[in-house]
């Protein structure tokens, strides 16, 4: 095989790890995927075995080489993208985690988050980190591990332990302990990092009693962090030179380099991120302020809205209600529905995310009649995803005083043409679906490739991931607003139901 050079992206997700090899045109040459165990010690708790994650990553690296015939010395650089917020604490000498990784979804630290709120820290944390106080972020997870593993606090203070999000853990393992680093986008999700001053926040560390010695060094999203130890990369010493949390990597992979550009990834949940440029903008309306990416000595901020249930609502139709045999079938049924959209599904199975942040809300359905069919119910479930996206897009426009013209989309549910057309209709703007839906891995590859000169600059990248399809709005204004008003009523009723005591 010719000695063509490639970039490898490692995409470490919530349920599986993947390795993807990309060529110079940004095309996928090969990929390998491996699922790993989800651990649920108690209701609402979600954990992973960090060593099992590492083993799965080693396995998919090998799989990507085997499938493509590409050799380790043909990999110019490695980019890493990861499930964000998930927290690992390990022993510096042995490299062994002292507890399972606590996953972003896990609610086991909710009492600690509530305690911080009741102590009056909400505003302080928001101003420094851009985040709301929530168990979602890493800070309370680190504190929980130090509290619940015997001797951990003392060992952390002695400098015997290290903390990292998954990116940090993987770089540490790949370099055989030579690099203990993270990047701006992952640091910004810990609730320990001051995103204005770009440093770990001493006051927050003191409030939570987390020793600074355990924290990784924070670096930009596109630079060489270290090289793979040859025995961890099949003989190759390859620079690891790009890193970003999954949603920020997707923003970069979608080429959303200009302020005002917005992308939405329709995955298990839905994550909408807007590039707000070099000015940090705190949301007045419950969106998160975070770092999009930092390259070439500049940091670009972002606003983010998280929807907990998106693609997983379609999985619920399939696995929970058995209304469809596979996810793509939901599109066919939705098109067969002939009602007037008076049914509303509010899929608040784990509470409502942005901009409501109501963790007590639960799923509900409104507007059922004797004539409601399976097709109507499926259509209403798909529409609920689009309504939630509108909630966030409207909020972003209020926060930034800008009119969003186009929404760039990717992720599994973005393949559903019915959903994409309804999304365009209910927003009244164009929906641009990426040609290459692997935008998360592609973003990590782009960041890595830029750092080593594999791609020259952002202008060269702009030629690599064009729009695959454009969905334009076709619904009249009064119909659009009437439907959305019904959705707002349904959400309000859902929240009222959650508040009523017996």
Swiss-Prot record:
Superkingdom assignment: Bacteria
Pathway: Polyol metabolism; glycerol degradation via glycerol kinase pathway; sn-glycerol 3-phosphate from glycerol: step 1/1
Residues binding ATP: 14-16, 268, 311, 315, 412
GO biological process, one term: glycerol-3-phosphate metabolic process
Gene3D superfamilies named among the record's database cross-references: 3.30.420.40
Binding site for sn-glycerol 3-phosphate: 14, 84-85, 136, 246
GO molecular function: ATP binding; glycerol kinase activity
Catalytic activity: glycerol + ATP = sn-glycerol 3-phosphate + ADP + H(+)
Keyword annotations of the record: ATP-binding, Glycerol metabolism, Kinase, Nucleotide-binding, Phosphoprotein, Transferase
Functional summary from the UniProt entry: Key enzyme in the regulation of glycerol uptake and metabolism. Catalyzes the phosphorylation of glycerol to yield sn-glycerol 3-phosphate.
Name of the protein described by the UniProt record: Glycerol kinase
Species lineage: Bacteria, Bacillati, Bacillota, Bacilli, Lactobacillales
Protein encoded by which gene: glpK
